[in-house]
Design a protein with these regions (language model features):
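A short glycine-rich, His/Asp/Glu-containing loop-to-beta-strand
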Residues: 1-27, 31-32, 83, 104-146
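Short acidic-glycine-tyrosine-enriched beta hairpin
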Residues: 48-63, 106-109, 165-188
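Intrinsically disordered terminal extensions flanking catalytic oxygenase cores
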Residues: 153-154, 160, 174-179, 192, ...
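Glycine- and acidic-residue-biased ligand/ion/polar-headgroup-sensing regions
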Residues: 29-48, 56-59, 139, 145-166, ...
Length: 201
């Protein structure tokens, strides 16, 4: 899992950092980078001195417009850190770099919106007409994902678990990109955490 090139979703990355280890200094520009920690504690530190620490239940957005150089590393000396990052192209280029961080709502049994244009309360703002939702679904659930925009593409990613979408089975760490106006029906075959990323094509 890495570069997708699916509409405005440039990449979806799963990363595991060993205790005390990290990703060396690197640069980003003109990208909305959404970090979703799954276990452990992740620390971001940039060349301007800004530091952010995130843990499961948090969501963090780096809007790297004009550009920023930063490090990411596991803040724990004894626990691995596992997280997802979605990279989405922004609507506007070369805007001032900014950060946003929030705490997600309880996503048990249904999808909760965690990142969207405008943002509000527990939804962090991103500079794109894209919508990122997360759910924890019990086995036997059958539900329809309701799209925010008919013309948008939808990428469904199973963090862990197993589900069926239109007779296509997805399991741990696999995803499916969907194009079309229909909102898909998800049939949950095992307890699952599911990430849905809806983006303009």
């Amino acid at each position: 899992m890495g570069k997708l090139g699916f509409g405005q979703l440039w990449a979806l990355i799963a990363e595991t950092l060993a205790p005390g280890k990290g990703i060396p200094l690197h640069a980003h520009e003109n990208m909305e980078i959404i970090s979703i920690p799954l276990s452990g504690t992740l620390r971001h530190r940039d060349s301007r001195g800004a530091t952010h620490i995130i843990a499961p239940g948090d969501i963090h957005v780096l809007s790297a417009g004009l550009g920023v150089t930063h490090w990411e590393y596991n803040d724990s000396p004894n626990e691995p850190a596992h997280y997802l990052q979605a990279w989405i192209r922004p609507k506007s280029r070369m805007t001032p770099t900014r950060y946003a961080q929030g705490t997600m709502d309880d996503c048990d049994g249904s999808f909760c919106l965690i990142a969207a244009p405008g943002g509000c309360d527990s939804v962090v703002e991103i500079d794109q007409d894209a919508f990122v939702s997360l759910a924890r679904l019990p086995r036997g659930t059958e539900m329809q994902y309701s799209k925010y925009g008919d013309a948008n593409g939808l990428h469904v990613f199973v963090i862990d678990g197993r589900l069926d979408i239109g007779r296509k089975e997805l399991a741990d760490g696999t995803g499916l990109s969907l194009i079309g106006q229909e909102s898909p029906v998800l049939k949950v075959l095992a307890p699952s955490r599911v990430l849905c990323i809806e983006v303009p094509l």
